Amino acid sequence: MMKRLLCVLLSTSVFSSPMLGYSASKKDSKADICLAVSSGDQEVSQEDLLKEVSRGFSRVAAKATPGVVYIENFPKTGNQAIASPGNKRGFQENPFDYFNDEFFNRFFGLPSHREQQRPQQRDAVRGTGFIVSEDGYVVTNHHVVEDAGKIHVTLHDGQKYTAKIVGLDPKTDLAVIKIQAEKLPFLTFGNSDQLQIGDWAIAIGNPFGLQATVTVGVISAKGRNQLHIVDFEDFIQTDAAINPGNSGGPLLNINGQVIGVNTAIVSGSGGYIGIGFAIPSLMAKRVIDQLISDGQVTRGFLGVTLQPIDSELATCYKLEKVYGALVTDVVKGSPAEKAGLRQEDVIVAYNGKEVESLSALRNAISLMMPGTRVVLKIVREGKTIEIPVTVTQIPTEDGVSALQKMGVRVQNITPEICKKLGLAADTRGILVVAVEAGSPAASAGVAPGQLILAVNRQRVASVEELNQVLKNSKGENVLLMVSQGDVVRFIVLKSDE
């Protein structure tokens, strides 16, 4: 059976991997491309209807394509490993090779067996972007312009520009760059929340360097998460053909509006097999607006660790159906603690909107500006109550950055990860996702798959708690208590400060 492989859609001079983006037009052309199904009492033949559908796609392509651009990123260093959201350059040391599982390798941020067999050098990263303002703001994926040296942008008419980075957001894999030009054609955003399964979807991009390629499919699913591509996931799934080089390009509706930014595919070979993922336009636009105005993204913070609800938990906590998110821990001093949230509360709605999944709630809170008041509907001991909470700014990641400087990448552990690793569902700790070869962490014995249980003799159960501990111990060596299997050990990471 073909093994599943998550790919981001990048194209390089030696190797291609998938990515996505989006674009806009000067005017909303909705009225121009509506399909004429009937005219008065006159019946429309099947042939005429098909012609109208075809013309509709043609009109979208004609109006949107001028707003889609070809991006070439010449990184600061020429010889680099293949970049992707799940495979950060230079992070190696996989103790789990015996699983022989491509998805497992991707999850741990490691090169797949296929990638290890390919040349690991490149001269340029090539992808797609789309213009969102007439004065030259361009949206693409973060992984297209990551580690940028020179960025070249080629318009549909062949004009070439050098671009500068305006803002990056690796947590959603979005980026904004800018070219010095005026009166450009640009794309507008549609409402991704209004999408229905089966709606038409049109992708425009530069697969394998073939510029202005248009493909058509449908919306296959919404709200895809737990793919471990980026931190905040709420992907639209489509069968519109997306291939290496499409990264950062737009996914459009039949009105020519951007409903998503193409980002990744599932594939056994690195190419298209009918499953592609796009960042929904509502999430993308909120991130993009902040990148353009501030150069960075400010996210809301509640201060809870959550667990998905399954049918057994729904019965145990007397829920009317399988929905909501279970609070497994409350961060000390957080908005959640101050508002009175407790361990084992089940959050079933926020501001009147039902919590369909843990990821949906997490994404919604993260998109709220600090100071936003949100009313949480809680099921506690079988009773329903409402608790108002004022969201604050998500804590800085100084602690995580300190670990990254030492060569370690971490993430919160989830029930899905526990299942994958054969751990108990209630396992607490922080998962080591990857370790950079030759780093202080690698030399000290830190390895992917280990669980960090304590830092500087303080128990930690979330990345937020890790941040707080490390922020209070700047300039000091870091003492980690880690476990792997039944073995617990202590590791000292020496600080450079």
Curated annotation (Swiss-Prot):
Give the UniProt subcellular location, in the record's own words: Periplasm
InterPro entries from the entry? PDZ (IPR001478), PDZ_6 (IPR041489), PDZ_sf (IPR036034), Pept_S1C_Do (IPR011782), Peptidase_S1_PA (IPR009003), Peptidase_S1C (IPR001940)
> What gene, per UniProt, encodes this protein?
htrA
GO cellular component assignments: outer membrane-bounded periplasmic space
Provide this UniProt record's keywords sorted from A to Z.
Hydrolase, Periplasm, Protease, Repeat, Serine protease, Signal, Stress response
User: What EC designation does it have?
Assistant: 3.4.21.107
SUPFAM superfamilies in the record: PDZ domain-like (SSF50156), Trypsin-like serine proteases (SSF50494)
Q: Does the keyword Nucleus apply?
A: no
The main location is periplasm
Q: What is the lineage of its organism?
A: Bacteria, Pseudomonadati, Chlamydiota, Chlamydiia, Chlamydiales
Region (Serine protease) residue ranges read 128-289
Q: Which organism is it from?
A: Chlamydia trachomatis serovar D (strain ATCC VR-885 / DSM 19411 / UW-3/Cx)
Which reaction is the catalytic activity of this chain? Acts on substrates that are at least partially unfolded. The cleavage site P1 residue is normally between a pair of hydrophobic residues, such as Val-|-Val
UniProt enzyme class: hydrolase
Residues that bind substrate: 245-247, 302-306
Query: Known Pfam families for this protein?
Result: PDZ_2, PDZ_6, Trypsin_2
Q: What is this protein called?
A: Probable periplasmic serine endoprotease DegP-like
Q: What family is this?
A: Belongs to the peptidase S1C family.
**Family annotation (CDD domains):** cpPDZ1_DegP-like
Can you supply a Gene Ontology BP term from the record?
proteolysis
List the Gene Ontology MF annotations in alphabetical order: serine-type endopeptidase activity
Tree of life domain: Bacteria
